[in-house]
């Protein structure tokens, strides 16, 4: 196929119905008038994305061509597809958009000028273009003159594939083509596919520049100390990094350079199931005019939102620009991280609520990426399921996990960054018997870790997972810190702990070319 960018420039972008970087007001107006959008009492635009309310990982492909073939860690998550399949779908896309009204966002991903990437997002829905405008970094005056995107996203929810003809998995497709520098999305109205596709592109490109891309949130204290929060969807990244005593750098995607960390994005995409003003005031207050709410339940007569209602999905989302968060770091940058927090939502209830990690343990747990998949974040998940997602973001990491872990280990060692594993999941028993760890306790533990208050306390070793558990922590009951003591039945605890330990050991077998120092972190099954 000819250069896709040239085809887009000479074809799609030459029609009369193209809107470039429309103001928020206009996009909202179109979404309400033509796309079923409803304005809530708080001013946010409410959109229902239909049957696809989460990512469709089975439908994501990477075009397998020479420039990427030897670099990508091909697996069931990183599935290859031929250039021919892509070309055929792109031709369908060109026919699909003929004479359509289209919305184009031109801006950037990456707040560090040395590493930012100019992107173009082309949408057939105004609300998705509003999403792109609020999620990515808007251009400043003059930055769109002679704009030359390095990557283009073409998102066409109404273009559905025919698997038998098109070689896809279903009617939905998300295809990354690095040779043509384009992401082609069809069949799904879930806006998160746009965001995560560009994240995946950055995760592929940056390690070649000695930058560690990270699925994490980041914040900074008044004294300049930076903290990173890693974790899969629903583990508490957004919630825990929204701290009134610290400034938010970003809530989901960052890069770590020799100079510090930078946010990839200009917005936030927060889960809002069971959202309350009391528990999460920063997120609550950010949901206002200009924000988008996906798949929440709204009373169309009163405009009242019921954040507790999950009739469409548990994966309800709010998208808003980072400046809607009070005291956010609008330049999106911070210094070298002082503290790293790995978040896991352990549904077995056996991991400690907080444990301090060595460099080798940090690399091990980073590569393992253990959590329990929570309902609604992907299609088909209705109860928590144990899962291992490398680098706490497996679906978005295209290179070998060892590549990212090596970069992390080097940076931890070079800058003496402290690392903690924090369990935001269950305590006192597994899911269904125990209870979710209280948010106020988790906040206190995280605060103590960041302030260095856990550097001087005594630690005990967990006999199975070999984790260092603090014996005390400010504002946290002592009995909460040691998980075995929160269970009524010690034998049941031992059984569950050994089951999870076996899962860790089994999962880590897939990493063959790692040092013994890291392999030896494996739990000791008893």
Curated annotation (Swiss-Prot):
Catalysed reactions, semicolon-separated: oxaloacetate + ATP = phosphoenolpyruvate + ADP + CO2
Residues the entry annotates as binding Mn(2+): 196, 215, 252
One record GO biological process: gluconeogenesis
Protein's cellular compartments: Cytoplasm
Recorded superkingdom: Bacteria
Example of a GO cellular component annotation carried by this entry: cytosol
Known pathway: Carbohydrate biosynthesis; gluconeogenesis
UniProt binding sites for ATP: 196, 215, 231-239, 280, 317, 442
Requisite cofactors: Mn(2+)
Binding site for substrate: 55, 190, 196, 317
Function: Involved in the gluconeogenesis. Catalyzes the conversion of oxaloacetate (OAA) to phosphoenolpyruvate (PEP) through direct phosphoryl transfer between the nucleoside triphosphate and OAA.
Protein known as: Phosphoenolpyruvate carboxykinase (ATP)
Record organism: Alkaliphilus oremlandii (strain OhILAs) (Clostridium oremlandii (strain OhILAs))
Gene: pckA
């Amino acid at each position: 196929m000819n250069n896709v960018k040239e085809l887009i420039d000479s074809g799609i972008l030459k029609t009369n119905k193209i809107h470039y970087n429309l103001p928020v007001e206009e996009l909202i107006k179109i979404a309400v008038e033509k796309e079923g959008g409803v304005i809530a009492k708080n001013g946010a635009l409410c959109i229902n994305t239909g049957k696809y309310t989460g990512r469709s990982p089975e439908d994501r492909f990477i075009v397998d061509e020479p420039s990427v073939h030897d670099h990508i860690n091909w697996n069931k998550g990183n599935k290859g597809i031929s250039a021919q399949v892509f070309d055929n779908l792109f031709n369908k896309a060109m026919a699909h958009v003929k004479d359509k009204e289209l919305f184009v966002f031109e801006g950037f991903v990456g707040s560090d000028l040395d590493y930012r990437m100019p992107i173009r997002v082309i949408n057939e829905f105004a609300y998705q273009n509003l999403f792109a405008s609020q999620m990515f970094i808007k251009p400043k005056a003059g930055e769109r003159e002679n704009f030359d995107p390095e990557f283009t996203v073409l998102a066409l929810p109404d273009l559905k594939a025919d698997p038998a003809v098109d070689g896809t998995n279903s009617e939905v497709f998300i295809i990354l083509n690095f040779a043509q520098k384009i992401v082609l999305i069809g069949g799904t109205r879930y806006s998160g596919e746009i965001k995560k596709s560009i994240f995946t592109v950055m995760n592929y490109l940056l390690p070649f520049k000695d930058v560690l891309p990270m699925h994490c949130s980041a914040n900074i204290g008044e004294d300049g100390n930076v903290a990173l929060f890693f974790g899969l969807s629903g583990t508490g990244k957004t919630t825990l990094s929204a701290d009134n005593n610290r400034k938010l750098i970003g809530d989901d995607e960052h890069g770590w350079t020799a100079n510090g960390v930078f946010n990839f994005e200009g917005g936030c995409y927060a889960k809002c199931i069971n959202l309350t003003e009391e528990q999460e005031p920063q997120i609550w207050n950010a949901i206002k005019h200009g924000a988008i709410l996906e798949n929440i339940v709204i009373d169309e007569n009163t405009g009242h939102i019921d954040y507790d209602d999950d009739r469409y999905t548990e994966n309800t989302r709010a998208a808003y620009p980072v400046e809607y968060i009070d005291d956010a770091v609008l330049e999106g940058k911070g210094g070298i991280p002082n503290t790293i927090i790995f978040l896991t939502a352990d549904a077995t209830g056996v991991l400690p609520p907080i444990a301090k990690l060595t460099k080798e343990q940090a690399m091990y747990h980073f590569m393992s990426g253990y959590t329990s998949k929570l309902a609604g974040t992907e299609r088909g998940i209705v109860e928590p399921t144990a899962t291992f997602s490398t680098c706490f973001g497996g679906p978005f990491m295209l290179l070998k996990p060892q590549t990212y872990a090596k970069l992390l280990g080097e940076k931890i060692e070079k800058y003496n960054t402290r690392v903690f594993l924090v369990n935001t999941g269950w305590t006192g028993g597994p899911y269904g018997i125990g209870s979710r760890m209280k948010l106020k306790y988790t906040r206190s533990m995280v605060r103590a870790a960041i302030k260095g208050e856990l550097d001087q306390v005594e630690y005990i070793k967990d006999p199975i997972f070999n984790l260092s558990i603090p014996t005390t922590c400010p504002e946290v009951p002592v009995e909460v810190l040691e998980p075995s003591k929160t269970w009524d039945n010690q034998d049941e605890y031992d059984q569950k702990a050994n089951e999870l330990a076996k899962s860790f050991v089994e999962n880590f077998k897939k990493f063959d070319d790692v040092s013994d120092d890291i392999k030896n972190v494996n739990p000791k099954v008893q």
